[in-house]
Amino acid sequence: MKKVLYIAFNYNHDTGIASKRIRGVSKYLPSFGWNPVVIVPRTSNETVEIDNVKVVETDYQDMISKFMPKSNNTGRKREVSGRDQTNRFVSKSLSLAGEIFAYPDSMKYWKKPAFEASCEIIENEQIDAIMSTSSPVTSHLIAHELKEKYDIPWIADLRDLWNLNPYINHNFIRKFFEKRLEMKTFKNVDVLVTTTEIAKQTLKEIHPQKRIEPVVSGFDEEDFKNMKQTRKNEKLTLMYAGSLYSGKRDPSILFDSINQLICENKIDKDKITVDFYGDETNLAELSRKYDIEDNVKIHGRITQKEVLTHQMNSDVLLLISWMDESEKMFIPGKVYDCMGCKKPVLSIGYREGSLKDLIEKTDIGYHVSDVDECKKAIYDYYTKYNNENLKYCGNEFADEYSMKNTAKRFAQILEEIL
């Protein structure tokens, strides 16, 4: 059995979608002839134990608390006081400090202990290949230095692009240094991996000579093996889990659509509810604007396991994306949970792109980009719910999006670069 050293900062995280791809690949690589040795930071998270996966914890100094103020966002309006103004100044100052000192990311102090632990493993075990996954990009810096020292084949998995990530807004000075660092880091990489074909073409613009392979994610069937809906909802229940990225993912189309359908007497205001699990970016204020505050329930962040439980007990799962052309390259990991839960999907986002193509290919629901389309989708789901025939309609293509197939593709690439 061959061995791959896997630099994966988020392996143990249980509140983010990133860990699902990492753990899924680690779990199923042994089925295709590769045993992973996963390098992770020692944090408060418990180590996830998976058969045939060796996890090595390293020392880790957290930097983020030095630069990021604790959030006190309750979703309620507050009067602006002198103290608020001071806090805003402090927040901006900390943000600027982060631009300077948290370069290339706030996990930079993990690089040294992770590199040293990796060297020890390589020198004492037969490591055939290296994989690194971002974010954080520090993972790739570690792999780059290992590649330089040992000349072992290396795959860099970019779950999100580095400099071409529209969700990260650096100043022009930081952008200059980031791009230079990306070019230097990937100079000796064997294969760059993205999550979609569009992301591959985008990355090709700055790495035209590199081999780039799109490897989509998927759902792990075992996560859903013993899960089932435990209650019947008295209202059509829509659910969204995750971040709204400070308004980039805007639920206005959803709220406006529900409001219009209620005003048109097409749906009963007392027969629909929307649950949000995650951050609270303007949700309360926005729901009041559209007069549906009684229909919108705002909850805090929960673990991935809790997310799946709530998804199983919801009727329709929401995906809300940024209404920007750059969003075309993304497929949010949550869509694979929708397939695993076998729940209908309502996706709201840019009019075209990877996500829309996937939803249409698999027939798992609707992808809409304006209020009229959204109203039609909600009304269709509402009517089917009232007639007790609302169900998941994913076709045979949906079953192809499994973590086992994702790991299989990584194993194929690993074999090709030996």
Explain the meaning of each model-derived region.
Residues 24-25, 101, 138-141, 145-149, ...:
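Membrane-proximal helix-turn-helix segments that form the acceptor-binding/catalytic region
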Residues 231-248, 255, 406:
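Conserved donor-binding/catalytic core segment of Leloir-type glycosyltransferases
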Residues 41-112:
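A conserved catalytic-core segment of Leloir-type glycosyltransferases
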Residues 249-252, 303-309, 317-336, 346-357, ...:
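Nucleotide-sugar-dependent
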Residues 63-72, 219-234, 385:
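Acidic anion/phosphate-binding donor-loop and adjacent secondary structure
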Residues 269-273, 283-308:
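Nucleotide-activated donor-binding/catalytic signature segment of Leloir-type glycosyltransferases, i.e.
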Residues 198, 218:
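Carbohydrate-associated surface elements
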Residues 1-64, 191, 197, 212, ...:
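N-terminal subdomain of nucleotide-sugar transferases
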